[in-house]
A protein has these predicted regions:
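Glycine-rich phosphate-binding loop of actin/hexokinase-like ATP-binding domains
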Residues: 202-243
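Nucleotide/phosphate-binding catalytic cleft detector across ATP-hydrolyzing
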Residues: 1-16, 20-205, 223-225, 234, ...
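Small-residue helix-packing motif on alpha-helices
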Residues: 251-254
Length: 254
């Protein structure tokens, strides 16, 4: 019988799929108890799954390896989503009130919901980073409780091709692996893990150099301000080095 005692996560990248499982300690840290990986090059390119059958087989193999090391079943896994089509787009939603009123949480929630419903062609909104709210002529990060008649929410939407999310979900469904909660945006999850609060507040850029892609994030005042994925990674450098008549294995080491 599957148990929820363990916390498990799976990361999908162009070079490999990694799975990890453990238990949460009393101090909040995670004690790693199992790890497994599979080559992803036969079914992932630029961070996107293109062969669902092979991806499902690899996911099944990883879960089996993790459960074998744990000597127990895994109920759900946390999954991060990334890939070349991942990027940010700006959007604004405005409301005019009948008279000056105190901005409520309900109104802010309605504005956020309207932002998520913005029509996109072949794209899906994966997550949203609220930037600030303009109430009358003043900008606020926390709008609830502020008096005003005009409010505009400014948002940074993290979007990706609809097929990116669809193929990932189909792969997990075929492997009969249940995803815990919503999909995590892998680059922002990484940023929360490696950047300090001071770094994100004062302003910094995080560059994640992968096999097929390079992801760039910019933070300022503890808010994500920019995210983009470049279609270049370590494999491009390796291929350039092999043109100097060097074996790929040696080029990879360099």
């Amino acid at each position: 019988m599957a148990t929820t005692d363990f916390i498990a996560a799976i990361e999908l990248s162009s070079s490999k799929i990694s799975g990890i499982a453990g238990k949460k300690s009393s101090d909040g840290s995670i004690q790693v108890l199992a790890y497994a990986r599979e080559d992803a090059s036969p079914f992932i390119h630029k961070g996107a799954i293109y062969n669902i059958d092979k991806a499902a087989q690899a996911l099944t193999s990883i879960i089996n390896k993790l459960e074998g090391q744990l000597n127990n079943s895994i109920a759900k896994v946390y999954v991060g989503i990334g890939g070349q089509s991942l990027r940010t787009v700006r959007n604004a939603v405005s409301r005019t009130l009948e008279e000056e009123s105190i901005i409520s949480q309900e109104l802010v929630d309605e504005i956020c919901d309207e932002n998520r419903d913005v029509p996109l062609v072949d794209m899906s909104v994966l997550d949203v980073a609220p930037q600030e709210y303009k109430i009358d002529n003043t900008l606020h990060v926390e709008p609830v409780g502020v008096a005003g008649r005009y409010i505009t929410g400014q948002f940074l939407n993290i979007v990706a091709r609809a097929s990116l999310k669809k193929n990932l979900e189909h792969s997990f469904e075929q492997a009969k692996v249940e995803i815990a909660d919503d999909l995590l945006v892998a680059p922002t999850a990484l940023a929360k893990a490696v950047l300090t609060e001071n770094e994100m507040r004062s302003g910094c850029a995080l560059v994640d150099f992968g096999a097929d892609t390079t992801t760039v994030l910019v933070y300022k005042n503890n808010i994500l301000r920019y995210l983009s994925v470049l279609p270049l990674g370590g494999n491009n450098i390796t291929h350039d080095i092999t043109s100097l008549q060097m074996e790929e294995e040696e080029a990879e080491k360099l």
